[in-house]
C-alpha cells in the first residue's frame, strides 16, 4: 500500500508538481529590488545596503519555485547585468515611482536590455514601486514614461507596488505564474 502511494505521489508531482522559473530582477539603484526580494522571501522588511554583485533567493508561490536574482543597479555595474541573461524566463524591472528625474534613465536601461537576443522570450513584469510616497507616478504614467505600450512582441505587465508593505508584490507573481502556465505544456 505504501509503495502504491509513493508511486502515485511521484506521478502526481510529475503532472501537477512544482514548476520552476528563473527571474532576473533589475532596475536603477535604490529602486527597491533587495527590499522586494526579502519581503517576498521572508515576509518582512530588512535593512539593506546598495547591492554590489547580486542576491539570489528561492521564493515558492502557487506551486511555482521562483529563483530570483536581484542584481545591483548602480550605473557602473549595470553592464554586468548581461551575465545573468542566460536561461532567464522572466524579468522584474523595478522602478522608483517617486524618482521623476531618473525615469528616462530607467527607460533607456530597460530598452537596452529588452533588445538583447538572450531575453527575447522572457516575460516582463514592471514593479512601479514606492507607491506609498505622495508624489509617486501611478502605473499608467510609468507605462507611458517607459514606453511599455510599444512592446508588441513581448508579454508584459505593470504592477503598482510598495515594497515595505508588500502591496502589489504577490499580484505581480500571480501574473508571472499565469503566464508561465500558458507557456508550459
Swiss-Prot record:
Keywords: ER-Golgi transport, Golgi apparatus, GTP-binding, Lipoprotein, Myristate, Nucleotide-binding, Protein transport, Transport. GTP-binding protein involved in protein trafficking; may modulate vesicle budding and uncoating within the Golgi apparatus. PANTHER family: ADP RIBOSYLATION FACTOR-RELATED. GO terms for cellular component: cytoplasm; Golgi apparatus; plasma membrane. This is ADP-ribosylation factor. Pfam families: Arf. SMART domains: ARF, RAB, SAR. Belongs to the small GTPase superfamily. Arf family. It is found in: Golgi apparatus. A lipid is attached at residue 2 (N-myristoyl glycine). One of its GO terms (molecular function) is GTP binding. InterPro entries: Arf1-5-like, P-loop_NTPase, Small_GTP-bd, Small_GTPase_ARF, Small_GTPase_ARF/SAR. Its main location: Golgi. Coiled coil: none annotated. It comes from the Eukaryota.
Amino acid at each position: 500500500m505504501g509503495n502504491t502511494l509513493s508511486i502515485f505521489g511521484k506521478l502526481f508531482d510529475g503532472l501537477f508538481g512544482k514548476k520552476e522559473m528563473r527571474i532576473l530582477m533589475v532596475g536603477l539603484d535604490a529602486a527597491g529590488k533587495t527590499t522586494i526580494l526579502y519581503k517576498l522571501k521572508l515576509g518582512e522588511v530588512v535593512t539593506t545596503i546598495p547591492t554590489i554583485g547580486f542576491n539570489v533567493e528561492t521564493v515558492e508561490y502557487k506551486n511555482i519555485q521562483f529563483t530570483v536574482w536581484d542584481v545591483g543597479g548602480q550605473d557602473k555595474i549595470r553592464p554586468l547585468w548581461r551575465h545573468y541573461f542566460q536561461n532567464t524566463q522572466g524579468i522584474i524591472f523595478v522602478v522608483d515611482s517617486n524618482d521623476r528625474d531618473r525615469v528616462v534613465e530607467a527607460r533607456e536601461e530597460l530598452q537596452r536590455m529588452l533588445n538583447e537576443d538572450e531575453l527575447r522570450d522572457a516575460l516582463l513584469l514592471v514593479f512601479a514601486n514606492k507607491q506609498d510616497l505622495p508624489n509617486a507616478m501611478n502605473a499608467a504614467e510609468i507605462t507611458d514614461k517607459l514606453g511599455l505600450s510599444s512592446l508588441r512582441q513581448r508579454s508584459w505587465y505593470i504592477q503598482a507596488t510598495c515594497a515595505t508593505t508588500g502591496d502589489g508584490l504577490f499580484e505581480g507573481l500571480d501574473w508571472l505564474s499565469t503566464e508561465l502556465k500558458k507557456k508550459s505544456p
